[in-house]
From Swiss-Prot:
UreD, UreF and UreG form a complex that acts as a GTP-hydrolysis-dependent molecular chaperone, activating the urease apoprotein by helping to assemble the nickel containing metallocenter of UreC. The UreE protein probably delivers the nickel. Required for maturation of urease via the functional incorporation of the urease nickel metallocenter. GO terms for molecular function: nickel cation binding. Belongs to the UreD family. GO terms for cellular component: cytoplasm. The gene is ureD. Keywords: Chaperone, Cytoplasm, Nickel insertion. Pfam families: UreD. This is Urease accessory protein UreD. The lineage of its organism: Bacteria, Bacillati, Actinomycetota, Actinomycetes, Kitasatosporales.
Length: 252
């Protein structure tokens, strides 16, 4: 820990074990980012991200990296929601997620929600790099404020590249200090939970998904090549999860 806040990195590396399963030659966490391997499901290795401390707080910088080799299947979840909080250190906290999946590898990235507590300032950056033939389910859920409080400032950027080609690059800022209109009808429309689901499957190249609405506040959009994006808004985290789960089920 420094005067500027806590610096912590967690790394996961998955590869085929030669017996039809997945091994984890790299499983390293530090400080507030603890990693625990849980019971596997078939050929899939499962890892839980456990927050060993509060945060991220102001000035903290957390990084989580996951690399999935050809033939490996990895499922990553978290034990509880992540709560961005104000801290003694001044300035914005940062949370970086770096995901790489090789051709023939599969990653299911399904953490719990990120909650932007009142007074916090957090920048979240997620960069996903896939080789053609990789498979991905990526879920991101954000809740603006705890019950009965105003949100902090939350800026989130998500980029997806397949075979080195940019397929998705979007950024959204919410809360105090964000560009005007973030809570208006063109963006959140008064909702306090927002989420997205990115699904990449090689079969989408042959049979692309069809753009359609999923209820009143969610939409499915085909992206370039083998990818599809679901974006959703909801009044709370419970309803948001329900919408995203139903969307994933509809994709088969």
């Amino acid at each position: 820990m420094t005067a500027a806040g806590v610096r912590a990195t967690a790394r996961i590396g998955a590869r085929g074990d030669g017996r039809g399963g997945t091994s984890l030659p790299v499983l390293e966490g530090e400080g507030p980012l603890a990693l625990r391997r849980t019971r596997a499901s078939g050929s899939e290795a499962r890892v839980m991200l456990v927050g060993a401390m509060s945060g991220p707080l102001g000035g903290d910088h957390f990084t989580v990296e996951a690399t999935v080799a050809a033939g490996a299947r990895l499922h990553v979840g978290s034990a509880a929601a992540t709560i961005a909080l104000p801290g003694q250190a001044k300035g914005e906290a940062r949370y970086d997620v770096l995901l790489d999946v090789a051709a023939g590898g599969e990653l299911r990235w399904l953490p719990e929600q990120l909650i932007s507590a009142g007074g916090s300032e957090l920048y979240v950056s997620t960069r996903i790099d896939l080789e053609p033939g990789a498979r991905l389910v990526f879920r991101e859920e954000q809740v603006l404020g705890r019950v009965g409080e105003e949100p902090g400032r939350l800026t989130s950027r998500l980029t997806l590249r397949i075979g080195g080609r940019a397929v998705l690059d979007q950024e959204l800022a919410c809360g105090p200090g964000a560009p005007g209109g973030w809570d208006g009808p063109a963006v959140l429309g008064g909702h306090r939970a927002l989420g997205q689901l990115v699904v990449v499957r090689p079969e989408f190249e042959r049979e692309p998904v069809r753009a359609r609405l999923l209820g009143e506040s969610a939409a499915l959009t085909p992206l370039g090549g083998a990818a599809a994006l679901v974006t959703a808004l909801a009044p709370d985290a419970l309803l948001l999860r329900r919408v995203l789960d139903e969307a994933l089920s509809s994709l088969g």
